[in-house]
Amino acid sequence: MLLSSAAALLLPSTSFDQPQKGWEPLLDKNLSKWRTYESYRHQNGYKGQQPVDAEGKPLTPIGYDKNEANVFSVVMEQGQPVLRISGEIYGCVFTKQDFKNYDLKLKVRWGKKKWTPRLNEPLDSGILYNSQGECGVDYWRSWMLAQEFQVSEYRDGNAMGDFWCIANSSADIHATHNTTENTLKFTPAAPLLTMGKEGRNFCQASANYESPNGEWTELELLNVNGQSVHLVNGHVVLAAENSGYLANGQRNPLTHGKIQLQSEAAEVFYKDIMIKPLAAMPAAYSKYFK
C-alpha cells in the first residue's frame, strides 16, 4: 500500500520532515537500520515470467529477512563497517525508515563475483529511492516501486548514475537520443521527456566518472520534493523531476519512501552511507530544473 503525502507527515523524524543538523550514518555492523528481501536465483532465459520448479510448479520467493546464503553481510575494514552484497540471489537491503527531502552519500566498490544470469553482463547494482509498497512488483520480482540511481560498471551503454523506472514509476528528464547506443541520454539543454511511458524507462548518465576498478566511487543523491540529482565523484550526471508513479492511467506523486540497495547478480561493497535533511534543493542545482 502506498503512503500518502499526509501520511508522510506522521512518519518518524528520520523522514526529515523535521530538519535535523548533521549527517546520520545508516550503516552499522548489525545492519540495525535495514531489512532484507530475496526473491529468486534467476536463471538464463528469464523474461519476467513466474519462476517454476522442475515440475513446472510456481516457486515461492524466499521473502523478507531470511538472508539465505548470507547475501547481505557487514565486514569490517580499518575498523569501519562495509556492507557486502554477494549478488547470488536477486533482492535488496532496504531502510526500515521512510525518508523525504534529503542528501544521501555513500561509496561503492566492485567485488570479484558474478552470477547467472549476468555472467556476461556489466557488474550491476543500484540505489532505489522513493521506494514504496511491497518488494517483488518489478520485472525481476525483487524490488519495490521506486526510482533508480543505477550503480553499474561503465560498459555496454551502462554507467554510474543512469536512471531506471522501477515497476510503474515515472519521472521527467531532459534527454536526447543517443544514436550510437540507441537510447536516451541526460542532456541539460534538451527538452523534458517523460519516463515510464511509451517504452521509455531508461536514461543514460551524461558521462562516466566512475573510479578505476578496485577503488571506491563516491555517489550522492539529492532528493527534494520530486526533484532528484545524481552525482558521481562530485559530478552531476543526471537530474530528474516530477517523480511519480502511474496507476489507472493517472500519474501520482512519488516523493518519499525507503531506500533500497540492489542485489543483482554481482558482488558489490558499500560504505560511508550517510543521510541528512534538506529543506530545499540547493541553489547550485536549480539550473537543472528550469
Question: Which role fits each region the language model picked out?
Answer:
Residues 5-20:
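Bacterial Sec-dependent signal peptides at the C-terminal "C-region" and cleavage site
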Residues 1-3:
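Bacterial N-terminal signal peptides that target proteins for export
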Residues 16-290:
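Carbohydrate-interacting regions of secretory-pathway proteins
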